[in-house]
């Protein structure tokens, strides 16, 4: 048994990654997060992420790894865990194509040998946009995630087009980053 405090929307995923292998080795059949006051407050941010499912770049060919389940139990409900609790889980799966593109630009280098080497500059162009209300605000403001990088890449592209480097520059603005780095995973697998 290990106690931990979850105090941010990303920490359930971090804690799972940190302790999942140890739990497997110890023969765990599941992981139960018992919230504290701080992680209770993050539930409104965490719940949509827990419901969104798994995205893969290979579509129907994607192998979804079977894993031990993870449950989130609010502290006030932890008495339910005493004795011999049982739970029934109904799992639904669906497959669909997620529309997305990678935007790629190249400025060829000036050096006859070095132009075959590439400097990769990248970011992503998607954003979640709207979420469940948090303090009556439903907008995910995306200036830094990731509009500022797109603007920076465009500015660098303009600068390099006027004064090319010795090496070629590859500009990639990935799609579907918010769905699990799909655009960058696709580009890495299919350069």
Predicted regions and their residues:
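Extracellular/luminal Protease-associated
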Residues: 1-60
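Acidic/histidine-rich catalytic neighborhood of metal-dependent amide-processing enzymes
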Residues: 15, 99-102, 129, 135-191
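Short alpha-helical segments and helix-capping/turn motifs at coil-helix boundaries
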Residues: 13-21, 25-26, 90, 101-107, ...
